[in-house]
Design a protein with these regions (language model features):
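Catalytic-loop region of hydrolases
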Residues: 1-58, 67-72
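N-terminal cap/lid subdomain of alpha/beta-hydrolase-fold enzymes
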Residues: 43, 51-136
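Conserved hydrolase catalytic core segment
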Residues: 170-212
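Alpha/beta-hydrolase-fold enzymes
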Residues: 194, 200-296
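Short alpha-helix in the alpha/beta-hydrolase fold that links the catalytic acid
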Residues: 321-327, 350-360
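Catalytic active-site module of serine/aspartate enzymes centered on a nucleophile-bearing elbow/loop
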Residues: 356-358, 362-398
Length: 398
C-alpha cells in the first residue's frame, strides 16, 4: 500500500489524493447510540512495510482534516493552513498544502522514508468523514443537530475500525497536537496493546476551566445566530455564518499569545494615521485580521461540526473517564512510551497540564519524556515551530 503521489520536491510527499472508506459495521458510541454507514476520509504517505508494523497515525485538531501533508490534487477554495502567519509562511501554496506538511515527509519528523503515515478526517468532521452535514440513512436528509453527540473515544473507535479495515492492527506511534494529542492519549489507554508510542503535542489530559469557558462562548455564538435554525440549516440557503465567524475569532485569539499579537499588530491602525471615528468598521489592524480569519474559516468549515468537535474536546477527561477522578489510576494501563511537547506561551493548553501528566506517568514507572519549548506564538506553536519539534520527535522514534 502506497500513497498516490507525483511532482515530488525534496522533502515533500508530492501530490496526494484524499480517499474514502466505508466502515463495514455500525459504530457504537459513548452516548448509547450507534452510527450506520460511517465513511472515513483519509490520506496516506510513504510505504507500508511487509510486516505492516511501520504505521504512524497523525490526528488533527478541531479545524483540521485528512489532508495533513503534500499538495492536494484538487485544492480546496480555502486551505486548512489559514492561521497565524499563514501567508508569510506558505505564500501561494497555502491552499494546497497539508496542515502539517512541515512535519510529514522524507527526512522530516514523521519520516516517510521509514514510516507509513496515515491521516483521517475525524468522526463528526465536514471534510469527507461522516458528520452532521452527512445524510442520515434513516431519513434521507442531513443529520444536522440530530447527529449524536460524540466523544474523543468515539473518534478513536472510528479510527481503529478504519485501520482494521485496512488490515492494520499495530501502530508504531499515534501523534497529534491539541485535540489530536487527546486522541493519542485515548489510543494509549483504550487500545494500549496496539500502540508502541504516542506523541501528544500542546495537549492535555483534561482542558482547564478557562478553556471550557472559551469553548462555551464560541458555541453560544453559533447557536445564537438565527440562521443556525436549530442545527437544520442545510439546504435552506442560509447558514450561521455570523455566529461561526465570531466563534472563529474567539478561538483564534485563544490560539495566540499576547506577545505574538503585540509583535505582529501592536495598536497599529488599519488604514490611516489617526482614528476615523467609525463605530462598526475595523479601526485597528488586529480587528481587520480577525475579520479576515473569520471570513476564510466560514468558507471552509461547517458550523455544526464546530459545535460537535468543541463539545467532544471539552468532555475529554482521562481522570474522570478511566481513573475514578484520579489521573494516577487512569494512566496505569498505558504501556506505550510517551513524548510530551508543550510550549511556554500556550495559555490554552499550558505546559502545566503536560507536566502533571508527565509526573503521573513517571510516578507509575512509565517511559515518558517532556520537552517545554520556549516559543512566543501561543497554542499555534505546534503548527509553527516545526523545526524545533522535529529533532525531538526523530530521536524519540529512533
Amino acid at each position: 500500500m502506497t500513497m498516490r503521489a507525483s511532482r515530488r520536491a525534496p522533502g515533500s510527499v508530492g501530490t496526494v489524493e484524499t480517499r474514502f472508506l466505508d466502515l463495514p459495521e455500525p459504530l457504537p458510541l459513548d452516548c448509547g447510540r450507534e452510527l450506520r454507514s460511517v465513511r472515513m476520509a483519509y490520506e496516506t504517505y510513504g510505504q507500508l512495510s511487509p510486516a505492516r508494523d511501520n504505521v504512524i497515525l497523525v490526528c488533527h485538531a478541531l479545524s483540521g482534516d485528512a489532508h495533513a501533508a503534500g499538495m492536494a490534487s484538487t485544492p480546496a477554495s480555502e486551505g486548512t493552513r489559514d492561521g497565524f502567519r499563514a501567508d508569510e509562511r506558505d505564500g501561494s501554496l497555502g491552499k494546497a498544502l497539508g496542515w502539517w506538511d512541515g512535519m510529514i515527509g522524507p527526512g522530516k519528523a514523521f519520516d516517510t522514508d521509514r514510516f507509513f503515515v496515515v491521516s483521517t478526517n475525524l468522526l463528526g468532521g465536514c471534510r469527507g468523514t461522516t458528520g452532521p452535514s452527512s445524510i442520515d440513512p434513516d431519513t434521507g436528509r442531513p443529520y444536522g443537530s440530530d447527529f449524536p453527540v460524540i466523544t474523543v473515544a468515539d473518534m478513536v473507535r472510528a479510527q481503529r475500525a478504519f485501520l482494521t479495515s485496512l488490515g492494520i492492527t499495530q501502530l508504531a506511534a499515534v501523534a497529534g497536537g491539541s485535540l489530536g494529542g487527546m486522541q493519542a492519549l485515548e489510543w494509549a489507554i483504550r487500545y494500549g496493546d496496539d500502540v508502541k508510542a504516542i506523541v501528544p503535542i500542546a495537549s492535555t489530559h483534561a482542558l482547564h476551566p478557562q478553556g471550557l469557558a472559551w469553548n462555551a462562548i464560541a458555541r453560544n455564538a453559533i447557536v445564537a445566530d438565527p440562521d443556525w435554525q436549530g442545527g437544520h440549516y442545510y439546504g435552506t440557503g442560509k447558514a450561521p455564518n455570523a455566529g461561526m465567524g465570531i466563534a472563529r475569532m474567539i478561538g483564534h485569539i485563544t490560539y495566540l499569545s499576547a506577545s505574538a499579537l503585540q509583535t505582529k499588530f501592536g495598536r497599529q491602525l488599519q488604514s490611516s494615521d489617526d482614528v476615523r471615528y467609525r463605530l462598526m468598521e475595523p479601526e485597528f489592524q488586529v480587528e481587520s485580521y480577525l475579520r479576515y480569519q473569520a471570513d476564510a474559516f466560514v468558507r471552509r468549515f461547517d458550523a455544526n461540526t464546530y459545535l460537535y468537535m468543541s463539545r467532544a474536546l471539552t468532555y475529554f477527561d482521562l481522570a474522570r473517564q478511566y481513573g475514578g477522578g484520579r489521573l494516577a489510576d487512569a494512566i496505569r494501563t498505558i504501556s506505550a512510551k510517551t513524548l510530551l511537547i508543550a510550549f511556554s506561551s500556550d495559555w490554552l493548553y499550558p505546559p502545566s497540564g503536560s507536566e502533571e501528566l508527565a509526573a503521573a506517568l513517571r510516578d507509575a514507572g512509565k517511559p515518558v519524556s517532556l520537552h517545554v519549548i520556549d516559543a512566543p506564538y501561543g497554542h499555534d506553536c505546534f503548527l509553527l515551530e516545526e523545526a524545533r519539534q522535529t529533532p525531538l520527535i526523530q530521536a524519540f522514534l529512533d
